[in-house]
Amino acid sequence: MKKVKRNYRICAVYDTETCNIGKGNLTRAYPILFIDNDIRGIDLLEYETGRDDKVRFYRSEDEYLSRLEEYIEWGLFFKVVPVICAYNLMFDLQPLMEKMSRDYDISANAQSSTNVYTLDLIDRETDRTVLRFWDTFHLEMRGLKAMGETCGLPKATGDWDYSLVRTPQTPLTDTELYYAARDVQVIPAYLKYLLHANEWLTQDMLGNRVLTKTSLVRQMAKHTIAPLRVDKKSGKKLTLEKAFTKLCEAELPKTFQQYCLRKGCFRGGFTFTAAATANEVVHNVASLDVTSMHHTFINGRYVPLGFKPVLPGLLEIDYNEIMAINRKNVLNNYHKPFKHAFHMVIRLKNIRLRKGSCFDKWGIALESSAKFKKEVAPGLDFGEDPRNAVQENIVKEFGFYDKYVDAEFAFGKLYSAREVTMHVNEIELWCMGRVYEWDEHEILFGEDTCSWKVPPDYVTLQSNILYEMKNDAKYINNHYKQGEPYPYEIKGTIPDGIAASLKNGTCTAQFFEAWYVSTVKGQFNGIYGTQAQDVYKPSYKCEQGELMIDHDTETTQENWEEKQPKTCKVFYNY
């Protein structure tokens, strides 16, 4: 069936004011005011607070639900999907969920049952999306106050006394209503800022292709890097987007077992705790900027490709190679420190901290105790997204998790064990060889490759362009004086519109600093997030007004073939 293209249109901003009853864990919030800012027909590029607002107040769920029906009718008439923006959407939407689910099917693109990106109302007869709610929290996670500061519209403070007990019938003062209205004005002002800060961004992308800071990075790449063409050996041209998509699809795991093995051999980083000084104040501590290290990791090394299952005997050669390489050689050949890359399951006997090493002296262990758990929980030992935890537990149920016999754990780390069976890649095994020692090893199974290539241009260019833009913007931010034409050279990384306003001195210092700090640095730091995800995780469903994980969409051995993505822009080897 041909996919129906839908046009999404920002039409309103939604918020509530609530009152609390009860104390402590028994505290409950209930809504006493529903706030709606109708911004249909407004050009967000020219939005002006006050002039372009149509703020209405409703005191009951039914009153506001009637308002939603008006938006739905408007969308059907103009053949668009109305988008209603909010901040921390599910808190404000909870009073409406049960009633909305009676009349519509509900589909959510969510991080958790209380943290959604979008929530769609779907007509049961036509199976058509008729309304979308969009949580703008994921554009600026520091709060509406920070969002307002970025776009130059401070959030109102101090005008609403939350200690008072109110009901939907309690009269509200003009001052209280002014306070309540400000939050539904901050969001369109922030969207205006985004449109001016990203010249490639159009209004029809908002609430559709642009939902989060990470999606801003994706769309920046799609509109500025994806169209670039490279020559193929045949003489034909290939866009960087197509080249990257082909690479990602080629590197997807071929079987469920291969997927599980790679999940078990996760290519993540490590944290460290020094047991010997855990209860002491330590001076002269050095710290590394891990965000910048992401870009060293993205740009500064070759990536392995074309993994294939091999016999343990071949993996034994890989093992011996890894264990023979010293730290100096790794640092001198950071771009490609090893001849082979692999994912293997290995059994180690009598593992302990390496005698005479700094790790033994200071009690620094490497391997996380979470890797040895048969089940993980979101927020505790496996991120915040419950879907990732569910998919991880499916892999663990299939037997792909680390195991131990008579182990000693402390500070969330493995210090010793009579025996461990572990899933490791070449980087992790090399690191383990620096920290631990063991008496015997046995390789059970795995996959390897000796094929390495420079990292894909599609991602590398994102990093390089934003890094250069960040440095150029930093210099301007330190030297620009509002109201005066900028006297120095403006590099080509600065968007034309912003460059023109700098040259004639009309750019406000507040806008430029916000663009530098929030947009440029934010997108630069968000590149890694576009690749750090599992394309096989399940989705959400709504039942009786409650969001929950749809277990029918989990990826298992039985449905592996049907769960393959039609297209993919996530490169696992990052």
Walk through the language-model features, giving the residues of each.
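Short Lys/Arg-rich cationic patches that frequently serve as NLS/NoLS or arginine-rich RNA/DNA-binding motifs
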Residues: M1-N7
